[in-house]
Amino acid sequence: MVAEYLPGNRLTLLNSGEAYFPALLAAIASATEEIYLESYIFADDEIGHEVATALCLAAARGVRVNVTVDGFGARNFATDFMPRLTAAGVRAMQYRPEIGRFHLKRHRLRRLHRKLAVIDARVAYVGGINVIDDFNAPADMCPRYDYAVQLEGPGVGQVHHAVRRMWEIVSWANFKRRFRLAPPATPCCEKAGEQTAAFLIRDNIRHRNDILHAYIQAIADAKN
């Protein structure tokens, strides 16, 4: 996949969960049409419950809320959150849920590591932050330190397409929880800033090295 850079975006760097979750929760609270959220981990902690509550409130307002989590990273999601979310009208699924003990087999290592959110197809969040408190760590470890980017502008359409495609794939695979793909919100194509951005995905099949190649090309093209 060749990086398709789009001008006219506004990018906001969010430092760790301290900056990310207030921004995400505010965006969820303002949603009027649809929400897509993907996460490898959805922890049973204060942050997890704050996000779950915000999603439930959005669904109660009539917003289409779609949540996809990994079946190993969020292996307790089905018991910790699924009943509450589905009762509120949230559509939630697990990617490749693990049944029984996790034995090391190559095909079981294919996980959903993406951490993405798209709100009303107008603002997207991309980065490395799971739905988990920064301080939810063993006592002898430092808090998590990671970043996310808030994206507004034409580039949101690329992220929106990716989350809808993943929802379609996981829904097809979840025979007992198949959901019809609703008509999408219209991605915002209006200029939101002066920054150029491209969204790239990585997988172990067709796009294994796309991000690496984009890094190398960007470094080679650097002028300052």
Across the structure, where does each feature detected by a protein language model lie?
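Charged, low-complexity intrinsically disordered terminal segments
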Residues: 1-224
